């Protein structure tokens, strides 16, 4: 965030300085002034705009990071592993024709975020597995079900599957999805071990998992809110941003 503030300050100061110089610079051309009437032809300062039809940061018409019109990682228009457009082993220059493409680096920020929120479960489309919880003590309305629950609660889940809270519009949607995927995964896993669940088991699991999903939602919502508030505080309290705001106020008042 601090680096972003420095960049914003540098960009603003550069633009302000450039505007000031443009206002003070004498107009070229005219009789016996030694200047050209067409400032775009042969100007000694060169062209400040990107050459050869590319956009900013594209020196030869390619996309960002494409120096000669190829796609990402293709410096001369060839496919991956073809440095100069030829087939495999037909590239020219000093490139090593048998080099394998470098492995992509792991984004440590993403790994840290996933570890903080919960372990991402492979094969479940972005679901995460929450931390283990104590199974709640629930009363089902009659002594037989209460006793059955106490004797079998160890067979029910103590962790829930969920997606990030920012993918849901409200708590009900989060809890509904959380309960469904958790019971489904727990039932499939347990069934493969040779153990089946009765209707009573499913009924009790729904009550237990629902309470755990509500707890998980409250925990994730608080963490998400704290993260956004912390990011905003860091951005607006950084010295470059404060200096930039002070400078803008000075320009407006002055």
From Swiss-Prot:
Keywords assigned by UniProt, alphabetized: Amyloid, Cell membrane, Copper, Disulfide bond, Glycoprotein, Golgi apparatus, GPI-anchor, Hydroxylation, Lipoprotein, Membrane, Metal-binding, Prion, Repeat, Signal, Zinc
Keyword Ribosomal protein among record annotations: no
Residues the record lists as binding Cu(2+) 2: 68-70
Gene3D superfamilies registered for this protein in UniProt: Prion/Doppel protein, beta-ribbon domain (1.10.790.10)
Annotated protein name in UniProt: Major prion protein
Signal peptide range: 1-22
Region (Disordered): 25-104
Lineage, highest ranks first: Eukaryota, Metazoa, Chordata, Craniata, Vertebrata
Function description: Its primary physiological function is unclear. May play a role in neuronal development and synaptic plasticity. May be required for neuronal myelin sheath maintenance. May promote myelin homeostasis through acting as an agonist for ADGRG6 receptor. May play a role in iron uptake and iron homeostasis. Soluble oligomers are toxic to cultured neuroblastoma cells and induce apoptosis (in vitro). Association with GPC1 (via its heparan sulfate chains) targets PRNP to lipid rafts. Also provides Cu(2+) or Zn(2+) for the ascorbate-mediated GPC1 deaminase degradation of its heparan sulfate side chains.
Localisation per UniProt entry: Cell membrane; Golgi apparatus
Stretches forming Sequence repeats: 51-58, 59-66, 67-74, 75-82, 83-90
Region annotation Interaction with ADGRG6: where it falls in the sequence: 23-38
List of residues binding Cu(2+) 4: 84-86
Keyword Lipoprotein included in the entry's annotation: yes
GO CC field: cell surface; cytosol; dendrite; endoplasmic reticulum; Golgi apparatus; inclusion body; membrane; membrane raft
Region: Interaction with GRB2, ERI3 and SYN1, residue numbers: 23-231
One MF annotation (Gene Ontology) recorded for this entry: metal ion binding
Region of interest (5 X 8 AA tandem repeats of P-H-G-G-G-W-G-Q), ranges: 51-90
Domain of life: Eukaryota
Propeptide feature ranges: 231-254
